[in-house]
Amino acid sequence: YKRKMHANYCSLSSKDFDKTLRETLPLETQSLGTRVKNFDSSSVTLADGERLEAGAVIDCRNIIASKHLEGGWQIFVGRHFKYKKPHGIKNPIIMDASVTQHAPSGNRSAYRFMYVLPLADDELFFEDTYYDEERALDENLLKYRIDQYNQQIGLEEGTEISREKGILPVITGGDFKAYLSSFEKQGVAMAGARGGFNHPLTSFTMPFAVSNALAIAGKANL
């Protein structure tokens, strides 16, 4: 079964996002590679002992494993290739589920698909994605499966520019209120994945992060 979607598809590379933020934000607002030691409703203490005072603190960290949540995992490896000649793929392939439907670990059945994004006439981004109950990522096997897929669709071997990988939680049930109460601090607002601001199926957070950032910048008393 094939279906062509007549809609726009937007994608943002980590490299471009990082570059734009560094160029746009004042240098004094950037704190890179810095770990937070502690925080409360009006301050954040960094690992090096520096204390940042603030009118408000928002916890936007990643989601954490909890006995209060139920679900599985979205597991993926993505690879960005450059080819010696144009690849000929004009539109994104959003979800090719014609690939084998199994997880690498234990050879269990799992919902798996490949997606392909044409980033330039001679560049493609491939991602091998599957949903599984086990939190296990075999990077080398997924890398190999992407190489196989390249051959299957008739492409010559390309040069890998970059690679990414991830294991994202897919929450299907549980007691979210109990989950939040297990770590939230009085007076500290919650956002990001830890606060549940993520898509229920993909676990992606970017659209929610943008909406929250605009709302905070536009209305908060900073």
Stretch-by-stretch model annotation:
Residues 194-215:
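A conserved FAD-binding loop/helix module that cradles the flavin
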Residues 214-222:
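C-terminal helical "tail/cap" subdomain of flavin- and related membrane-associated enzymes
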Residues 116, 121-123, 183-201:
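Short FAD-binding loop at a beta-strand-to-alpha-helix junction that anchors the flavin cofactor
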Residues 2, 131-133, 195-198:
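A short, flexible beta-alpha/helix-coil linker loop
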